[in-house]
A protein has these predicted regions:
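Short amphipathic alpha-helix that is part of the acyltransferase structural core
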Residues: 2-41
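A short catalytic or substrate-binding loop motif that flags glycine-/basic-rich loops and adjacent residues
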Residues: 38-42, 187-190
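Conserved beta-hairpin
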Residues: 30, 43-64
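Extracellular structured ligand-interaction cores
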Residues: 15, 43-45, 122, 192-194
Length: 223
């Protein structure tokens, strides 16, 4: 959800379009409206456009996970090396608050299809719902994503502007002492709920993709 919005406009899904866009508008939009205040500069972005008002009202940003272990962890042992390159992550997803009911599921389903069309190699898209901010993944559940449990708890920093900062910045581990020197405060991050969307090739089914995975499909968490 967005941190703020353009209230007062009447919007209709009939006027919405999903477009694969560059980062020059999409990334600043995410930084302004996503609760984290941050977005990877190299993300693959799909934008939600309100054509009636010629306005950007949402962004889905995908980034390949830096950690090879994260990408490998989805697959059975005999598939880990082959399929680790077929995983990406829904890095940021945000829409303005004044969009109609079901906008988020409508938008995300089309962004995922757009991603598969653009990069057919991707078979799995992982996404995390952050309990620290009260998220359980309701949108992902509505799109039948596979829920495969929680990550471990961790820490994060907040900078002087209130933006979240990762303990790993630009490939460099930031210690607690260094964070304090920068004026950052230390916070505990609760576990994240882990989901994966399956993107089968035309000759496959979702069941075919899931057969190569080692994760267990669990019951959805409730808010």
């Amino acid at each position: 959800m967005a941190r703020n919005s353009s209230m007062g406009k009447t919007r209709s899904i009939e006027n919405f379009e999903v477009r694969h866009t560059g980062n020059s508008e999409a990334v600043p939009f995410v930084k302004q409206h996503h609760y984290s205040g941050r977005c990877h500069g190299g993300a693959m972005c799909w934008s939600l456009i309100d054509t009636k008002h010629d306005e950007l009202i949402g962004v889905a940003a995908f980034v390949t996970p830096i950690s090879e272990n994260v990408r490998r962890s989805l697959w059975e042992d005999n598939k880990k090396e082959e399929l680790k390159h077929h995983v990406t992550e829904l890095h940021r997803f945000v829409t303005l608050d004044d969009t109609p009911h079901n906008t988020e599921t409508w938008f995300l389903s089309r962004a995922l299809k757009g991603l598969k069309d653009y990069k057919p190699k991707y078979k799995a898209v992982i996404s995390f719902a952050d309990e620290t901010f009260g998220h359980v993944g309701t949108i992902y559940q509505a799109l039948n994503a596979i829920y495969y449990g929680k990550s471990g708890s961790a820490k994060y920093y907040k900078d002087e502007d209130g933006n979240m900062r990762s303990p790993r910045e630009g490939g460099y581990n930031v210690s607690n002492a260094e964070a304090k020197e920068r004026g950052w405060t230390i916070h505990k991050r609760e576990s994240k709920h882990r989901y994966v969307f399956l993107l089968p090739d035309p000759y496959e089914s979702k069941e075919d993709v899931f057969e190569d995975m080692c994760v267990e499909s669990l019951e959805y968490p409730k808010a």
